[in-house]
Amino acid sequence: MRNVTLILDDGSRFSGKSFGYEKPVAGEVVFNTAMTGYPESLTDPSYAGQLMTLTYPLVGNYGVPPFTIEPNGLATFMESEKIHAEAIIVSDYSYEYSHWNAVESLGEWLKREQVPGITGIDTRELTKILREHGVMMGKIVFDNPIDNGQLTIDNYAAVNYVDRVSCKEIISYLPDGTSRSFPLTMPIAQLNCQLSTVNCQLKKVLLVDCGVKTNIIRCLLKRNVEVIRVPWDYDFNGLEFDGLFISNGPGDPDTCDAAVQNIRKAM
């Protein structure tokens, strides 16, 4: 394991060991208090661009489930199709894992996804700093200066992370586990016609995808509705729907002016 250091914007330094992919990264440092669910948290699009600190001391003891896709295109055990967090920071990483559904260790998964992981960090002290001063920018650097290059800490709020994680097409999900995709260039009138051909009895919920988790879509489908998922900046005015759902997501909402304008017109 290589030595690695987390450096915060205020100059605070935390030394640890690497157990994931070895590359320097920078991002907004945040903490997560969940006792379990690191596969779901890491694949949550809301964590895009962030260095995730887990406050629960022991992490990795139940490994990582397989990545499988359901017939409707949703990930079975994850919140999206890939890891979105820039890195994971833990106090004590367990190299041994045991779970009926595990196929690999957390460290192996991180290396395959090219995401750094740090263990041996005093996450209690780090969390106290973040709690008192609020989230702040930070960077992870390795013991070899050559590896770190010209790593700089950008302004997290200046990057439109929502645009990076939002869907790139219109997707219709049905309660029966099927889905259909439509190009963004399809005229609204034609799209309305296509959407009404399957089951006109179902209520339609329009989902503005600002970084939605798969579990949110599943919860909506359990209400026996059709979910129409559109990109964050898609002008959905003219589409026929019965309910409007705006998902959460990463980054600063100020970068999502197009979504605000579309929602304002709809309201």
Task: Describe the predicted segments one by one.
Residues Y234-E240:
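Short amphipathic alpha-helix with an adjacent loop that forms part of the alpha/beta core around
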Residues F241-M267:
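A beta-strand-loop signature enriched in Asp, Gly, Thr, and Trp
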